[in-house]
Structure formats: structure tokens, C-alpha cells
């Protein structure tokens, strides 16, 4: 199958950017999905030892991928400890 794809790419070189962008998009989406699965506090893989991982986050912990105008280090703690 890979030989057939390579043969088609050699005969139609205009398809090369299409393969590059689709492959790059698929790679970036898998990396983002992995980041969500490992770093997001809403997702818990170990229910016995850490059933509620969102309770261990402080107000100055950044778990978003991108924040525009927010400086998390200057926030005060306004939540009770559990």
C-alpha cells in the first residue's frame, strides 16, 4: 500500500502538500489529545489514590493551554483546604 501511495505521489506531485498538512494536523491533534489526557485536572486515571485531582490545584496553577491576559502567580488563595 505504501508503494502505491509513493507511486501516486511521484506521478502527481501536487498531492505532496496535502499529505504534509493532513499528516501534520493528525500529529498535532494526537499530541493535544495526549496533553489533555495527562495534564487536565478533569481527567483522573487513578481513582483509588486520587479520586478528585481538581481539589489539589491552587488558584495560581495554570492548566489551560493558552491564557491571554492572566497572570496566575498574582492570584490570592480564596478557597478552603480539603
Swiss-Prot record:
The alphabetical list of record keywords is: Electron transport, Membrane, Mitochondrion, Mitochondrion inner membrane, Respiratory chain, Transmembrane, Transmembrane helix, Transport
- Identify the main location: mitochondrion
List the stretches on the Mitochondrial matrix face of the membrane.
1-14
The UniProt record lists the keyword Membrane: yes
Segments crossing the lipid bilayer: 15-37
Q: Spell out the subcellular localization from the entry.
A: Mitochondrion inner membrane
Topological domains annotated Mitochondrial intermembrane: 38-82
Q: Topologically, how does it sit relative to the membrane?
A: Single-pass membrane protein
Keyword Nucleus applies: no
The organism's place on the tree of life at top rank: Eukaryota
UniProt cross-references to InterPro entries, sorted A to Z: B12D
Classification via Pfam families: B12D
**Disulfide bond annotation, renumbered to this chain:** none
Question: Which terms in the GO cellular component ontology are assigned?
Answer: mitochondrial inner membrane; respiratory chain complex IV
* Function text: Component of the cytochrome c oxidase, the last enzyme in the mitochondrial electron transport chain which drives oxidative phosphorylation. The respiratory chain contains 3 multisubunit complexes succinate dehydrogenase (complex II, CII), ubiquinol-cytochrome c oxidoreductase (cytochrome b-c1 complex, complex III, CIII) and cytochrome c oxidase (complex IV, CIV), that cooperate to transfer electrons derived from NADH and succinate to molecular oxygen, creating an electrochemical gradient over the inner membrane that drives transmembrane transport and the ATP synthase.
Q: Assembly and partners?
A: Component of the cytochrome c oxidase (complex IV, CIV), a multisubunit enzyme composed of 14 subunits. The complex is composed of a catalytic core of 3 subunits MT-CO1, MT-CO2 and MT-CO3, encoded in the mitochondrial DNA, and 11 supernumerary subunits COX4I, COX5A, COX5B, COX6A, COX6B, COX6C, COX7A, COX7B, COX7C, COX8 and NDUFA4, which are encoded in the nuclear genome.
Family named by the database record: Belongs to the complex IV NDUFA4 subunit family.
Please state what the protein is called: Cytochrome c oxidase subunit NDUFA4
Q: What is the lineage of its organism?
A: Eukaryota, Metazoa, Chordata, Craniata, Vertebrata
Q: Which gene encodes it?
A: ndufa4
Amino acid at each position: 500500500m505504501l508503494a502505491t501511495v509513493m507511486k501516486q505521489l511521484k506521478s502527481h506531485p501536487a498531492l505532496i502538500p496535502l499529505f504534509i498538512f493532513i499528516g501534520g494536523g493528525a500529529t498535532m491533534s494526537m499530541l493535544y489529545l495526549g496533553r489533555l489526557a495527562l495534564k487536565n485536572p478533569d481527567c483522573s486515571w487513578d481513582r483509588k489514590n486520587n479520586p478528585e485531582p481538581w481539589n489539589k490545584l491552587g488558584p495560581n496553577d495554570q492548566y489551560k493551554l493558552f491564557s491571554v491576559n492572566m497572570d496566575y502567580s498574582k492570584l490570592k488563595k480564596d478557597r478552603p483546604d480539603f
